[in-house]
C-alpha cells in the first residue's frame, strides 16, 4: 500500500491541495482571491512536476486498477496545464464574484480527469469520470445570478446523468458477460468474436464516453452549455475534459476491447463521421462566438476519432499530438473571447459585433485569425500538422474513405472560420465599441500561443514525435 501511494503523487497532491484551498476560502472569505488562487496554482504546478517525475515508470497500482505510465502522464500534463490557465485568468472575469469554490472545483475536476486517464478498471473509470462530472455541473452554473449559467448547469446535469446511466449499463453488461471489471481481464474474455451481449456493452460504454467528448449524436448539450456557462468555465470545458475523455476512450478501446476491434471500430468510425459533418455544418450561421467554438470542438473531436478509429499506434500518436495542438489553439481562442468587452465592461459574444475589430484591437484580431486558421487546419499554421497525422494513420489502416470524408469536412469547416475573419477585417465597424482590455498575463498567453501556432510549433515536431510515440507505445 505504501509503495502504491508513492506512485500516485499527482493525485495525492491534488487531493491535499484541493482541501487546503477549500479551507482557505472558508476561513479567509471571498475577499482573499489571490490567496486561494495562488494555492490552486501551486497545487497544479506541484502535481505536474510529480507527473513528470513519474514519466519513466510503467506499472500498475492498487491491484491493477490504476496505471502509472507515459500515456497517463502525457494526458495529465495537458490536463494540469489547461486547468492552470483556466484558474489563472478567472479572477478578472468574475470581478468580485470570484469564490474559493471555483479553483477548488477545478482541482477536484483535474483529480477526476487524472484518474480517468490512468484507469485500468471499469470501477476506477467511473469514479474518476463522476468526480470530474460533479465538479463540472457546479462550475457550469457558477454564476448564480445569471439565468443563462443556471440553465447551462441544469442542462448539463440532466443530460450528464443520462450519459452516466448509459455508461453504467454498458459497464454492467461488460461485467456480466466477462466476469471482471479489469481491462486486461475483459480483453482476455473477449477472445475472438464477441457475443451480442458484449457488443451491446461496448455500444453503451462508448455512447457514455461519447457524451463526455461531445461526439455526435451525444453533443446536444455542448452549444447551450458553452454559451451559458461563464467564459473561463467554457474555456475549461473545451480543453481539459476533452483530453481526459479522449485518453480514456483510447485506453479502453485498445486495452479492454482490443480483440473486438471489428465491433468498436465501426462505432468510432460512425462517431467520427457524424461529428466532423455536423460540427462543420452546424457552425454555419451561428451568431454567438461561444456557440460557434462549441461546434468547432465537436468538429475537431471528430478528427481525433479518425486517428483512434485506425486502431494503430500511429493513430494514437496522431490523437495525442492533436490533443496538444487543439489545447493550445482552443485556450488561445477563448482567451481572446475573454478579452472582448464593450464600453460598459460587458462580455461581447456576438459575431456581428466583431465587425471592424481589426481597427479597434488589431492585436486581438490578428491573434484570433491565427487561432481560427489553425482550428481549420490551414497550412502553414501548426493546426495542419495533427490533421495530417490522423489522416495518414487512417490511410495506412485502409480507412481511405474516412480520410477523404475528413478532408471534405475540413474544407466545409474552413468556411465559417474565414467568415469570422472577414467580419473582423472587411466589414464596417459595428455599433458596439469593443474595447478589449486584457491584462499582461492574458496578453502574454495569447501572444505565445499564436506564435507557437505560426511557426515555432514546427520546431518541436521531433520532440513531440518522440513523446507521443513513447506514450502511445504503452497501449500496444
Swiss-Prot record:
Q: Which GO terms describe its biological process?
A: ATP synthesis coupled electron transport
- Name of the protein in its database record: NADH-quinone oxidoreductase subunit N
Q: Which Pfam families match?
A: Proton_antipo_M
Q: How does it assemble?
A: NDH-1 is composed of 14 different subunits. Subunits NuoA, H, J, K, L, M, N constitute the membrane sector of the complex.
**TM ranges:** 5-25, 38-58, 70-90, 97-117, 122-142, 157-177, 196-218, 231-253, 264-284, 292-312, 318-338, 364-384, 401-421, 445-465
Protein topology in the membrane: Multi-pass membrane protein
Q: Which UniProt keywords apply?
A: Cell inner membrane, Cell membrane, Membrane, NAD, Quinone, Translocase, Transmembrane, Transmembrane helix, Transport, Ubiquinone
The cellular location(s) given in this protein's UniProt record come to:
Cell inner membrane
Q: What high-level taxonomic lineage is stated for the organism?
A: Bacteria, Pseudomonadati, Pseudomonadota, Alphaproteobacteria, Sphingomonadales
Give the top-rank taxon of the lineage listed in the UniProt record for this protein: Bacteria
Record keywords: Secreted included? no
> Could you tell me which PANTHER family the record lists for this protein?
NADH DEHYDROGENASE
Question: Member of which family?
Answer: Belongs to the complex I subunit 2 family.
Q: In UniProt terms, what function does this protein have?
A: NDH-1 shuttles electrons from NADH, via FMN and iron-sulfur (Fe-S) centers, to quinones in the respiratory chain. The immediate electron acceptor for the enzyme in this species is believed to be ubiquinone. Couples the redox reaction to proton translocation (for every two electrons transferred, four hydrogen ions are translocated across the cytoplasmic membrane), and thus conserves the redox energy in a proton gradient.
Q: Which GO terms describe its molecular function?
A: NADH dehydrogenase (ubiquinone) activity; NADH:ubiquinone reductase (non-electrogenic) activity; quinone binding
Q: What is its EC number?
A: 7.1.1.-
Q: InterPro entries given for it?
A: NADH-Q_OxRdtase_suN/2 (IPR010096), ND/Mrp_TM (IPR001750)
Reaction(s) catalysed by this chain, per the record, are: a quinone + NADH + 5 H(+)(in) = a quinol + NAD(+) + 4 H(+)(out)
> Can the keyword Transcription be found in this entry's annotation?
no
